[in-house]
Amino acid sequence: MNRDNTIAWAVDDLCVNYDHSDVLCHIAFSLPSGAMAAIIGPNGAGKSTLLKASLGLIRASSGQSLFFGQKFAKVHQRIAYMPQRASVDWDFPMTVLDLVLMGCYGYKGMWNRISTGDRREAMNILERVGLADFANRQIGKLSGGQQQRAFLARSLMQKADLYLMDELFSAIDMASYRMVVDVLQDLKKEGKTIVVIHHDLSNVRQLFDHVILLNKHLVCSGSVEKCLTKEAIFQAYGCELELLDYTLKLSRGKYQGSC
């Protein structure tokens, strides 16, 4: 496997099985540093599983993942992971500011005191995502879009080089959408690498420069032009293709290639 530090994320022959059933089969790709990538594919394609297995949150049956040429444990401080909103316990007694300050733990450690400077930085980040006025609100009292922005703020507090975000754009309003896009574009300009599990094919071309297209196996990894074709989408989505016709036409104006 490539150990070049210019490769932010490299996956080699990764397989995951649940109850003797294949969830991911022989996934292999490399993502260059500075890319802004969408992981796309139908429901059940293994998109979230790919992130979790790569981070060691679930066990892979074979293969491995490297980040910046190293195992995750060696470079975890350089990686920020944002889970699916649905997986979070929103009743947990934690304020928005507390959530953002959790982003310090990767580089400060769990038991080091949070400083006044840390709190000031967290408030600046909350201002950046439009949540400064909600700093002392319990996280479950936020709207869906605000909750996504709060977790994005926690990721920003980590000062990472690679951001892995599971369904970042899920259940957000237009104001949150625009704010999130602005933040991602700023991160891109800073040379950060961004990976988002994404479902709306109509805006992939506008938001991303790289695609990882899955359906339990890797269909395509590379530029949007390479992967967002009728052939590749049909391979991944199969009989769902007709349902995607309108969104793909919005994305490109027309299909590229033919079946």
UniProtKB/Swiss-Prot annotation:
It comes from the Bacteria. GO terms for molecular function: ATP binding; ATP hydrolysis activity. The keyword Nuclease does not apply. Belongs to the ABC transporter superfamily. This is Probable metal transport system ATP-binding protein TC_0339. The keyword Cell inner membrane applies. It is a peripheral membrane protein. ATP binds at residues 41-48. Pfam families: ABC_tran. One of its GO terms (cellular component) is plasma membrane. It comes from Chlamydia muridarum (strain MoPn / Nigg). It is found in: Cell inner membrane. Part of an ATP-driven transport system TC_0338/TC_0339/TC_0341/TC_0342 for a metal. Probably responsible for energy coupling to the transport system. Residues 9-241 form the ABC transporter domain. Its main location: membrane. Keywords: ATP-binding, Cell inner membrane, Cell membrane, Membrane, Nucleotide-binding, Transport.
